[in-house]
């Protein structure tokens, strides 16, 4: 019989992240699956749960831009591009930045870039601040299925065996907009 997790506190979720677990938490629009971006085993578990190819790359969500320095190489962006990006943060906007050469392929996928977001949603901010770094963030669903907007939908698609922050999603109608940091081109609406 698998263990059934109950509602975890931020501290409890941080402990689970440090143990290499995949967690479920609310985002601005849907429930997310998250894990430690520096733990390849955790990433592989997350990808297996979602039935998602590593080649697609993953999003990192953070409490502030400083938490993302380790992963992005913003030398390729000018002050106007950075100003445009920073005017959308914190908020539900994801930007695809050039990745540092040290950023692992399990985050970038087949690309030389990494998708990042600085959230203003308090549960995510508290979690990232307590954890001390960003989280991998992807919708809590099997690839090809609708993202889960309720805990019941998470359980129905993925089962019960996850540490969960059972707090409501913010309620935005769509997942974050994704744009290319250099060109400004919309990648996902």
Curated annotation (Swiss-Prot):
The keyword Lyase does not apply. One of its GO terms (biological process) is tRNA threonylcarbamoyladenosine modification. One of its GO terms (cellular component) is cytoplasm. Required for the formation of a threonylcarbamoyl group on adenosine at position 37 (t(6)A37) in tRNAs that read codons beginning with adenine. Catalyzes the conversion of L-threonine, HCO(3)(-)/CO(2) and ATP to give threonylcarbamoyl-AMP (TC-AMP) as the acyladenylate intermediate, with the release of diphosphate. It is an enzyme of class 2 (transferase). One of its GO terms (molecular function) is ATP binding. The lineage of its organism: Bacteria, Pseudomonadati, Pseudomonadota, Gammaproteobacteria, Enterobacterales. It catalyses: L-threonine + hydrogencarbonate + ATP = L-threonylcarbamoyladenylate + diphosphate + H2O. It is found in: Cytoplasm. Pfam families: Sua5_yciO_yrdC (PF01300). Keywords: ATP-binding, Cytoplasm, Nucleotide-binding, Nucleotidyltransferase, Transferase, tRNA processing. This is Threonylcarbamoyl-AMP synthase. It comes from Blochmanniella floridana. SUPFAM superfamilies: YrdC/RibB. Transmembrane segments: none annotated. Its EC number is 2.7.7.87. Belongs to the SUA5 family. TsaC subfamily.
